[in-house]
Design a protein with these regions (language model features):
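Loop-to-helix entry region at the N-terminal start of transmembrane alpha-helices
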Residues: 25-33, 81-102, 142, 186, ...
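Periplasmic/extracellular loop-to-transmembrane helix junction in inner-membrane transport proteins
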Residues: 1-38
Length: 231
């Protein structure tokens, strides 16, 4: 209990929040790297999952990346660190390996969840394959894709602490510095900040996902009615 109180005291000290190594700066670094990883992973996983889901080709890749979730991120980071050296390159690579599978799986599942009758009806009225993707399948998959983004973001925001393993970056510095100097109050305080960021981000993404699901259902109903009328 005394260590926990010391951690709260550490958090309540204004000096720990300011400066280049303060909580605010480290939090901004942490969130910035998380955002970068999710964006890069999305640029890879969303188009790939969309194409695989639409064409049915390359499904093995979804299974293979799903199996990659079992690979420990710290192990990937260690190997990447030996290869790429000190800096952000190694944690960026390791976090991409962590973030791509849930995004790819969610996108693939979302695209394939579109009723085949709806897709066939879209083809019957003359829509091209890109139009079917853009106007039918992708909007229908938006809810599941948002859930995948939420899952990937939470995993990354929790694991970005490992970036401090090879770089003086992010909230993980409080954990590693505290462990090195046996300043457990700093370690617990840093962990509390990470948890708070994760919970706040989860709440925001849950709200966005809920709204997307509502809009997706409305869009799907309107699209189905429109296709039926066209036929």
């Amino acid at each position: 209990m005394s260590i926990f109180l010391e951690a709260l005291s550490w958090l309540a000290t204004p000096a720990n929040w300011l400066g280049e190594s303060g909580i605010l700066t480290r939090s901004a670094e942490h969130l910035g790297l998380t955002f970068l990883i999710v964006v890069l992973a999305s640029l890879v996983a969303l188009p790939l999952g969309t194409v695989i889901g639409h064409t049915g080709r390359g499904r093995w890749l979804v299974s293979a990346t799903g199996a990659a979730r079992a690979v420990p991120t710290l192990g990937v980071l260690t190997l990447a660190g030996l290869w790429l050296g000190i800096g952000l390159a190694a944690p960026t690579l390791a976090l991409l390996v962590l973030a791509i599978p849930p995004l790819l799986s969610a996108t693939y599942s979302g695209i394939t969840s579109t009723p085949r009758t709806t897709v066939d009806a879209a083809r019957a009225i003359g829509l091209t394959e890109p139009q079917i993707l853009a106007q039918v399948e992708f909007p229908h998959a938006a809810g599941l894709i948002a859930a995948g983004v939420r899952s990937a973001t939470l995993q990354v925001i929790a694991t970005t602490t490992l970036a401090a393993y090879t770089a003086n970056y992010g909230l993980g510095r409080f954990l590693y510095a505290g462990l090195k100097t046996r300043d457990y109050a700093q370690m617990i305080g840093g962990a509390i900040v990470v948890v708070a960021l994760a919970l706040a981000t989860d709440a925001l993404l849950a709200l966005i996902a809920r709204r997307l699901r509502t809009r997706t259902h409305s869009f799907a109903d309107e699209e189905n009615n429109s296709l039926k009328e066209s036929l």
